[in-house]
Every structure is written in structure tokens, then in C-alpha cells.
């Protein structure tokens, strides 16, 4: 008599190491002002975030490997960015232009991008939000802003994790049903 297979006996991978841990978010902070960079870095670290800081949009693209050259500082598989926070007004390339390049990238378009600026210019804010910015924060950024962003991202990561685990459970049950019908 054949042994009946149950879902827990199936070799369905439960390895979730490739999924982002909702405990420590990795933020890429982009600002040409050293004072603002240090300030946002401090706020993010106090909020339990891993932080990588760069001083320009060009350096951010290099870090992400989106500069068209193969000189990224890290390998793609090691690069898990949960959020990009960028100043709007920077020499060379604005935060808006960086946002557009990120949203054009198939590898990074899903990463939320937050634009920061000391200038409260409504058409600029609207343009950034229409282009796909997650939020637009006025400087100086407050700890409450960072905590709100972090909490929102952690909830989104948790929902994504639960959705993946639910999908895997449904797949296992489907395989189990198929095997049961086939009487294997």
C-alpha cells in the first residue's frame, strides 16, 4: 500500500533568507550637504535602520550599479535597499532626476524613494509624487517622519512576507491534492 503524502512531507522550500527581514531596514541616503547627510544618517540610525550615505545622485547610481558601468561598490545579490531618501536640489543631477532613473530600472523600480527639500514648492512636490516618489519631506526632516516611514515600510515588508508564505502554502496544498488524486 502506498504511503499517503501530506503537505509537510513535500520538499517545498521554506527558506525565507532571501526575503527582507522586517527588523532592519537598509536606507540609501543621498545628499550633497555633509551636515544634512550626517543629520539624516543619525535620524535613521536612531530609528534602527542600516544606512549607506552618498554625496550625490551620481554616486547613488554608481552604488546601485545604474551608472552604465560595472563599478558598483557591491554585488547586486548583496544589495538589499529598502528605501532611498534623496535631497531634491543637488549639483549635477537632482533628486527628481535620480527618482526617474530608479523608477526606469527594472531591478530597483519597486524601492520606495523619498524626496527631501528645504523648499516647499508645490509644483515640484506634485511632480515628484506623480513620478512615483513615496513621499516628499520638508527639511529639516524630523524623527517622527523617519519613524513613520520606517513603520510603514516594515508593515509593507511584513505583508509581502505573509503573502509569499501564503502562496507557498497554497502551492503545497495544491501539490498534495494532485498527488492524492493520482494516488501516489
From Swiss-Prot:
The gene is ARR5. Residues 26-154 form the Response regulatory domain. It comes from Arabidopsis thaliana. GO terms for biological process: circadian rhythm; cytokinin-activated signaling pathway; regulation of DNA-templated transcription; response to cytokinin; response to red light. Belongs to the ARR family. Type-A subfamily. PROSITE patterns: RESPONSE_REGULATORY. Functions as a response regulator involved in His-to-Asp phosphorelay signal transduction system. Phosphorylation of the Asp residue in the receiver domain activates the ability of the protein to promote the transcription of target genes. Type-A response regulators seem to act as negative regulators of the cytokinin signaling. The lineage of its organism: Eukaryota, Viridiplantae, Streptophyta, Embryophyta, Tracheophyta. Keywords: Cytokinin signaling pathway, Nucleus, Phosphoprotein, Transcription, Transcription regulation, Two-component regulatory system. This is Two-component response regulator ARR5. The keyword Manganese does not apply. One of its GO terms (cellular component) is cytoplasm. It is found in: Nucleus. Its main location: nucleus. Pfam families: Response_reg. Induction: By low temperature, dehydration, cytokinins (BA and zeatin), nitrate and high salinity. Two-component system major event consists of a His-to-Asp phosphorelay between a sensor histidine kinase (HK) and a response regulator (RR). In plants, the His-to-Asp phosphorelay involves an additional intermediate named Histidine-containing phosphotransfer protein (HPt). This multistep phosphorelay consists of a His-Asp-His-Asp sequential transfer of a phosphate group between first a His and an Asp of the HK protein, followed by the transfer to a conserved His of the HPt protein and finally the transfer to an Asp in the receiver domain of the RR protein.
